[in-house]
Amino acid sequence: MQAGLRIDVDTYRGTREGVPRLLDILDEAQVKATFFFSVGPDNMGRHLWRLARPTFFWKMLRSRAASLYGWDILLAGTAWPGKPIGRDLGPLMRRALDAGHEVGLHAWDHHGWQANAGRWNDRQLTAQIHRGVDCLSDILGNPVICSAAAGWRADQHVVQAKQAFGFRYNSDSRGATLFRPLLADGRLGTPQIPVDLPTFDEVVGPQLQPGAFNEYILNRFAAQRLNVYTIHAEVEGIVMADGFRQLLRQADAREIEFNPLGQLLPESIEQLPCGQVVRGHLPGREGWLGVQQ
């Protein structure tokens, strides 16, 4: 059974500690994945103001965020400038590429994108993407071939802004099938590879304990599904690393074969159906996100 494995790297600590551990785990399992890196300042701690929103407060309690992520991640960029992830930790991003994994852009400023992408104008969106692409391409020594919007904060406005960068594909949305978004001028845009499986932090809580997660998520894989699964370097690369190692073993026993997302694309993208990325909501995730329509 074919599946796509996507690894989002949101923070400085996730890059420094989570990525090396994940590379070792993936090497042990002989699995290749797609890493999406945040490369600018780590300002993730600025999300704390969202605690005033009941849905975000409940999510933080439900997922036991302090123990799951660590206070250094939860406070990053609050009382001090965010550390420059790409400048300091670029060699770890190159290491992922050299190990045979697919590497793409997550964001320049992950917090900035999540907080503002829905209201930035065309110029601001393009500038953010441009900064990220320039930084990551300098680090890798290669063009950036794919991207994934931070927090799945994407809509048709974001889709249009990304067209100028010539990505092979984007993974900006939650959905069920590969598709090409319809652009304002009637053309079909860059292919979208949506995520169709929930993440650890979306489902773990009072009704599902961490130890039961692997069986829960593996039971969601099916031959007729897209089977794109997302992990986070800050979670599965640190506190849940042993659980992820076990998940890969259990997936192998079920004949689930993980691949980089780019390998899910057909030889000809002309056969992909048309769709759109619109704003929607998902259980377990606070705020809006891009969903396939």
Curated annotation (Swiss-Prot):
GO annotation, cellular component aspect: membrane
InterPro entries named in the record: ArnD, Glyco_hydro/deAcase_b/a-brl, NODB_dom, Polysacc_deacetylase_ArnD
GO annotation (BP), single: lipopolysaccharide biosynthetic process
Protein keywords: Antibiotic resistance, Hydrolase, Lipid A biosynthesis, Lipid biosynthesis, Lipid metabolism, Lipopolysaccharide biosynthesis
A Pfam entry, by short name: Polysacc_deac_1
Domain of life: Bacteria
Pathway assignment: Glycolipid biosynthesis; 4-amino-4-deoxy-alpha-L-arabinose undecaprenyl phosphate biosynthesis; 4-amino-4-deoxy-alpha-L-arabinose undecaprenyl phosphate from UDP-4-deoxy-4-formamido-beta-L-arabinose and undecaprenyl phosphate: step 2/2; Bacterial outer membrane biogenesis; lipopolysaccharide biosynthesis
EC number(s) on file: 3.5.1.n3
Annotated GO MF terms: hydrolase activity, acting on carbon-nitrogen (but not peptide) bonds, in linear amides
Record's keyword annotation contains Isomerase: no
Catalytic activity: 4-deoxy-4-formamido-alpha-L-arabinopyranosyl di-trans,octa-cis-undecaprenyl phosphate + H2O = 4-amino-4-deoxy-alpha-L-arabinopyranosyl di-trans,octa-cis-undecaprenyl phosphate + formate
Domain NodB homology: 1-259
SUPFAM superfamilies in the record: Glycoside hydrolase/deacetylase
UniProt similarity note: Belongs to the polysaccharide deacetylase family. ArnD deformylase subfamily.
NCBIfam families, A to Z: PRK15394.1 (NF011923)
Function: Catalyzes the deformylation of 4-deoxy-4-formamido-L-arabinose-phosphoundecaprenol to 4-amino-4-deoxy-L-arabinose-phosphoundecaprenol. The modified arabinose is attached to lipid A and is required for resistance to polymyxin and cationic antimicrobial peptides.
Protein name: Probable 4-deoxy-4-formamido-L-arabinose-phosphoundecaprenol deformylase ArnD
Gene: arnD
